Amino acid sequence: IQKTELELQNARKRIYYISLLRLILFVGAVANAIIFWSDGWLCLSAFAILPFILFIWLVKRHNFWFYRKDFLKKKIEINEQELRAMQYDFSDFDDGKEFVNPSHLYTLDLDVFGEHSLFQYINRTATPIGKQHLASWFNAHLENKEAIEHRQEAIHELSTDLEYRQQIRLLGLLYKGKPADTTEIKEWANSPSYYRKRTLLRILPTAVTIINFLCIGLAILGIISASIAGGVFVGFVLFSTIFSKGITKLQTTYGEKLQILSTYADQILLTEQKEMQSHILQKLKTELTSQNQTASQAVRQLSKLMNALDQRSNLLISTILNGLIFWELRQVMRIEKWKEIHASDLPRWIETIGEIDAYCSLATFAYNHPDYIYPTIAAQSFHLQAEALGHPLMDRNKCVRNGIDIERRPFFIIITGANMAGKSTYLRTVGVNYLLACIGAPVWAKRMEIYPARLVTSLRTSDSLADNESYFFAELKRLKLIIDKLEAGEELFIILDEILKGTNSMDKQKGSFALIKQFMHMNTNGIIATHDLLLGTLVDSFPQNIRNYCFEADITNNELTFSYQMRNGVAQNMNACFLMKKMGIAVIND
């Protein structure tokens, strides 16, 4: 950060000195033009026109250093954000709240999207399409060993290139775009050409240019009067206004949105210049191809064409150029020609950069956690084994890490324990790390090996007034969904917290026994947390397929303490009555 701040100070100094030089040159050029006006073109050129040319060059340098200043400010900002994120303040990053879906198989239960979510912790995307790609990976994790391993390779490769990742992010952040922009750009790329389809309109700019310069030449030679040449010019100016409405519509609808193309061009150029090693990144790089030029050159060409069209807002220049060469129509023709050549390329390039942007987010996550490991992915037979699993969003100085061992199919872990002892946190820890493993990201564990079955959870089912749906019915719907998927032959990894919470104790117990037995017969795997200690007796019926673990609450010297360490067996201590007494609520024993 200190090095970048020094560069920023240097950029600000250059901007100041260039501003001063521009002012001196402008004043000097005007003064020289007045002084040497009567001394002929040679003196005028030397003392007035040349300073104007130098002034224009300085304007370009000024723009460069303004961009450099913004770039450096943004670089300092993102590094400060990363420092805050190391202290578990990741409020600077987009939380993806628009992706929250209460009916999703696991994202709501695991706090994947929304405020203080896993997505917000990991998300470093700088393009709208990159954010959508990253969200889609969280919404639909991979279930194939080879696909996960290829993604692991790509993430690991990018995690070692901090400069590339920061450049991709910085370039994206300098453009203030909206998610809809890329969608509308794709719509424009796939829309038919209007002007180039009409032969008369195609030849019109050339014809107007020839007629104008012919009239100017004839006027100089004295064959026709200057007023005739001027009349022709004015006529063409008026004629050009016929096309203004359609061109204005194109400019207002897509012009601002296409400004993002300069960002994509820079990001594409960076990627073209980078040597890729992993299978996925090499494949993505091959998508950035074009017919006779590089993808970055093609995108930059379109960006320049759109910027040139934007100059029509300068009425004086646009009036002169339209009258002389039908400049606006000529520019639109060039833009449509570009579209005809690259209509199928542009959406592919945008998608590719978005995907690379998403990979950079996961690579930054890996870079920020050098002690995290990439899990081993098993090809056959479900099992899940891990040592020292921790939740990524928990303070590493306070997090108590636990393991898991599901060694065969079917197999269920039943977890019992007191309130606040750590059951629900453990379920989310397993679920989040399982999800990270299945999207190819590193996990917080000493060792982890998984078979990637589809994850399904039921941890925080809620009622719905809008759908006239009770809490209990909502939970039954989720359980029915799980059963339907199993009957359809899908392989699942199931995580449930307190089954059938919305009914009475006896009914709940009976239903829980029946559900777990059904899971056994359907050959599936998972974890169930419960307060019902009798569920622990199921191990007698399925000694090879069920294992009991617990989180205990210890009462010492009239104080409640938690170790948050998972132990073998069924919980022995409960704490509800103790907590009620501590809060002054009378507990009467019969």
Model-assigned labels for residue ranges:
Residues 58-59, 243, 362, 368-590:
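ATPase nucleotide-binding head domains, primarily ABC-like/P-loop NTPase cores
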Residues 1-418, 425-455, 477-478:
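Alpha-helical coupling/stalk and coiled-coil linker elements that connect catalytic or binding modules
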